[in-house]
Amino acid sequence: MDPDIRDRLWQSKLATFIAFSLNRGTATINDNFANGFESAVLVHDCWKSHFETSSITHQICTAHLLRELNYFEEHYQSSWARAFKNILYEAINLKKILSPADYYYPINQRTELEEKLGLLLQTSIPQYMKEVCSFQKRITRYKDYLFILSRGASG
């Protein structure tokens, strides 16, 4: 097999789909899922081609974010990364205690998390932490896709 061809994986609670492709681009996704994921929330690693895929909405994968943030903490001793991780853990804990009925009403804890995130995204990061600055810029662009699962599937 060509070493440049890699496996691409899509997974749900019921099935795993594996495709082989040279890239992770939109064409690869469209070749395998012409209609996108119109009845699903697409959870992914923030790759641009995934955002171009049709779905109910998108959710940035928390595990991917935490892995990056752990690296920033270890490599840069970044207090910004630590604060971002704390917000993610608060969101995870909030999701655990919410019932389906809770999503029909305003959730003050979620609003507080979004406010904390907004302040954190405005916080200046030292320029020598280039990767952390890039991460902050990416999250600022896609912040609306961070807490989707604490909103319920309909957003």
Label the model's feature ranges.
Residues 1-155:
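Catalytic center-proximal scaffold of phosphoryl-transfer enzymes
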